[in-house]
Amino acid sequence: MTMPTQESDLVLVNNTESVMEITLNRPDKLNALTSAMYRDLVKLLATAEQSDDIHVVLFRGEGKSFSAGNDLVDFLNAKPGEAGEAAHFIQAIHDFPKVVVAAVQGNAVGVGTTMLLHMDLVVASEDTKLITPFVDLGAVPEAGSAKLLPAWIGYQRAARMLLLGEPMLAAEALEIGLVAKVVKGDELDATARNMAATLAKKPPRALQASKRLMRESINKPLHQVVKEDLALFGEMLQGDEAKAVIAAMVSKSKG
């Protein structure tokens, strides 16, 4: 697999056992995201999507916070066309077909929170705060958060986040299903990496197809979802991947 040429060392990548680990590496600025960083992230996602060797992507942030969101100075100084780099990244992560895990600690501000809505499993440290201060910045919620948050956590909780700008703490985020697991800070990376490694060992086509069904079902009527998942279930069972897994299980049961 040929890795893309990156514009800076503010985004690091490490591939281990079918997992691409992407690290936001700007701890002195709380991993605030610049246009160049967004471009690097889009390139890495494209590489991961095209590679048969990568089954899962893991996002993490170096230092005490996952991400402070957009670098406002960079955003204000962006050249024509660069202001859309964040949107390109959100579109890329939304469309990404493989499973994405996130390890989140400290503050996740703005897009640092809304990007998580397009990832599949979020592991948070106990000190995590999900902060969406869009109105306070004279803006509006982005990355589909105005649709996804009310649908997932209820309008009133979403209004606390998006209108009042109240931080969502890790414990409540776990309780209402915004994150999959909350762990101690010193256990965060190991927990997220173990989760990613576990996912990467699963049959890749089945994993991707299951993610697609879950994501697409959000906007489809139940009867259509049932029809499509039953058809895909039958198709997958006839595939080489499922046959190999089932044959191995039968062989093991026979001793």
Give the residues covered by each predicted segment.
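Hydrophobic alpha-helical membrane-association signature
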Residues: M37-D40, E85, M115, L188, ...
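C-terminal alpha-helix plus adjacent terminal tail
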Residues: M1-E17, G165-A171, D186, A190, ...
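Conserved CoA-thioester-binding segment of acyl-CoA-metabolizing enzymes
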Residues: M1-E62, Q91
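Glycine- (often His-adjacent) and acidic-residue-rich active-site loop
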Residues: V42-A46, D53, G61-D95, A108, ...
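Crotonase-fold acyl-CoA enzyme core
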Residues: H94-P204, G239-D240, A244
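Terminal peptide-recognition signature
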Residues: I22, R26, L41, F59, ...
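Hydrophobic alpha-helical segments typical of transmembrane helices
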Residues: E85-F89, G144-L148, R157, A209, ...
